[in-house]
Curated annotation (Swiss-Prot):
Record InterPro entries: FAD/NAD-bd_sf, MnmG-rel, MnmG-rel_CS, MnmG_N, TrmFO
Chain's gene name: trmFO
Name of the protein in its database record: Methylenetetrahydrofolate--tRNA-(uracil-5-)-methyltransferase TrmFO
Pfam family, one: GIDA
Source species of the chain: Brevibacillus brevis (strain 47 / JCM 6285 / NBRC 100599)
Class of this enzyme: transferase
Length: 437
């Protein structure tokens, strides 16, 4: 019985990587890309893996999680990282590329693979057989409609509205208290109480902070239930104290009184190493987020592992819908990859395509599918997007807060990150050796 041909939809970073991994595993691929016949509002060429925003793939050092992620991908023969290394331009400790050379290199590598057939047409139905959907944040309206029918309307989102996520270790626990509003249920939130003076200082900084300019195709993403905190603030001096900063039902146990305003932090991962700022979705520029949110009591030295964003982004509720193998729970032959799974960033998207591609090929060959251990950055991201709270799920980028904590407490952050990086790469090395035995 001959092996099936696998269909990959979308030739962005994730789709190109998935197609490459499948072909490298000896399985035929049919790669569909609607460009140049049908363009998106953000793309300008017909090349694969076109970088539509920055030309930087971020940090390249092993003291940074995304640097470790790149190294994991190198060891798994990633075409995206190989192309980036070949097309790199000087960028200090980051990996930045000549975006035109990079896209051309990926395109040539994938197009010229003997097991890859490229089809330049738009897919408007979810194909039969083994399929990897990697159509990205600007998925076409026709395919979006089919995805909505497949997943259920409540599990497909068209914008990304996320509050900043903070490392728990960087929160000053002497200035916060643990409680739920009106003491309902278990004490689930960290609460940062503010005096009127502290609130006024925060308010003034917030309304004067710089925001990211919206792209034309993002102009209509805001609505009442998802208002940026800075827009809410500009509606009136006390508006936030009746919204996400309302103090009612929260008594500071140290004073026995209600505060003027309270900022709540909600646990964001099962290991309780990450917390998000409740209701603080924002469009502020990143340096301003760091400056303004550091005015919140307890967050003076906060480490933001994922900045708040609001932009156009088609993604699914992966905790409800996907397995850590990137398979759709209700159809084992259907895989998703890229930003639409809820990973955030160029490298993270490619990494998800790498794993989805490996697993799609293994399924075609009748082999057991793989789940990378959570000690790896790739494995921790797959675990996060498939086990996060589905009610509050928002996309996430690579960070050390996703991996299991180091057994002993290490105060030196750089040393701790080096230990976590070494563990991740040892784990990947063991995995690759076992895979080839």
């Amino acid at each position: 019985m001959s092996q099936p041909t696998i269909t990959v939809v979308g030739a962005g970073l994730a789709g190109s990587e998935a197609a490459w991994q499948i072909a490298q595993a000896g399985v035929k691929v049919k790669l569909y890309e609607m460009r140049p016949k049908t363009q998106t509002p953000a793309h300008h060429t017909d090349k694969f893996a076109e970088l539509v925003c920055s030309n930087s793939l971020r940090a390249n050092t092993l003291t940074n999680a995304v640097g470790v992620l790149k190294e994991e991908m190198r060891r798994l023969n990633s075409v995206i990282i190989d192309s980036a290394d070949r097309c790199a331009v000087p960028a200090g400790g980051a990996l930045a590329v000549d975006r035109h050379e990079f896209a051309a290199h990926v395109t040539d590598a994938v197009r010229n693979h003997p097991l890859v057939e490229v089809v330049s047409e738009e897919i408007t139905e979810i194909p039969d057989g083994i399929v990897v959907i990697a159509t990205g944040p600007l998925t076409s309206p026709a395919l979006s409609t089919k995805l909505k029918e497949l997943t259920g309307e409540e599990y497909l989102y068209f914008y990304d509205a996320a509050a900043p996520i903070i490392e728990k270790d960087s929160i000053d626990m002497n200035k916060v208290f643990v409680a739920s509003r009106y003491d309902k249920g278990e004490a689930a939130y960290l609460n940062c109480p503010m005096t009127e003076e502290e609130f006024n200082r925060f308010y003034d900084a917030l309304i004067s902070a710089e925001t990211v300019p919206l792209k034309e195709f993002e102009k209509e993403i805001f609505f009442e239930g998802c208002m940026p905190i800075e827009v809410l603030a500009k509606r009136g001096h006390k508006t936030m104290t009746f919204g996400p900063m309302k103090p009612v039902g929260l008594v500071d146990p140290r004073t026995g009184k209600k505060s003027y305003a309270v900022v709540q932090l909600r646990q964001d991962n099962s290991a309780a190493t990450l917390y998000n700022i409740v209701g603080f979705q924002t469009h502020l520029k990143w340096p301003d987020q760091k400056r303004v949110f550091s005015l919140i009591p307890g967050l003076e030295n906060c480490e933001i592992v994922r900045y708040g964003v609001m932009h156009r982004n088609t993604f699914i509720n992966s905790p409800k819908l996907l397995k850590p193998t990137y398979q759709y729970k209700d159809r084992e032959t259907l895989f998703f990859a890229g930003q639409m799974t809820g990973v955030e960033g160029y490298v993270e998207s490619a990494a998800s395509g790498l794993l989805a591609g490996i697993n799609a090929a293994r399924l075609a060959k009748g082999e057991e599918l793989i789940e990378l251990p959570p000690e790896t950055i790739m494995g921790s991201m797959a675990r996060y997007i498939t086990t996060a709270d589905p009610k509050h799920f928002q996309p996430m980028n690579a960070n050390f807060g996703l991996v299991p904590e180091w057994p002993e407490r290490i105060r030196d952050k750089r040393l701790k990150n080096e230990k976590l990086a070494e563990r991740a790469l040892d784990t990947i090395q063991n995995f690759t050796q076992e895979r080839h035995n």
